[in-house]
C-alpha cells in the first residue's frame, strides 16, 4: 500500500529523529487524518478536542508540549486560535 505523501515523508523523517515520542507521531497522524488531503501543505482547521481524542492524548499539557515541539522541529506550522469557538489552523510541512 502506498501511503499519502505528507504521512509517508513524516514517517521517514520520524524514524531517524530521536526527539519524537509516540505522542508526537500519534498527534501528527491525527492532524493528517483531519487534513483536507487535496493540497498537502495548505492550512486547515483543527480542534484540540478532536485531535486529543483521535491521538489518545489525555493531558492538555502533553498536547501543547507536542504541538510546540512539532513546530520547533519543523514538522508543522501552527496558528493558534485564542477564541474557544474557533478552531486553530495548522499546515503539515512538506519540506525535505
Spans of model-derived segments:
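Winged helix-turn-helix DNA-binding recognition segment
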Residues: 35-94
Amino acid at each position: 500500500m502506498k501511503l499519502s505523501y505528507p504521512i509517508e515523508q513524516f514517517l521517514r523523517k520520524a524514524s531517524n529523529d530521536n526527539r519524537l515520542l509516540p505522542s508526537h507521531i500519534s498527534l501528527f497522524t491525527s492532524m493528517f487524518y483531519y487534513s483536507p488531503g487535496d493540497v498537502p501543505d495548505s492550512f486547515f482547521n483543527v480542534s484540540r478536542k478532536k485531535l486529543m481524542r483521535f491521538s489518545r492524548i489525555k493531558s492538555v499539557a502533553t498536547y501543547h508540549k507536542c504541538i510546540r515541539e512539532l513546530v520547533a522541529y519543523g514538522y508543522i506550522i501552527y496558528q493558534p486560535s485564542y477564541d474557544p469557538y474557533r478552531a486553530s489552523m495548522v499546515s503539515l510541512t512538506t519540506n525535505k
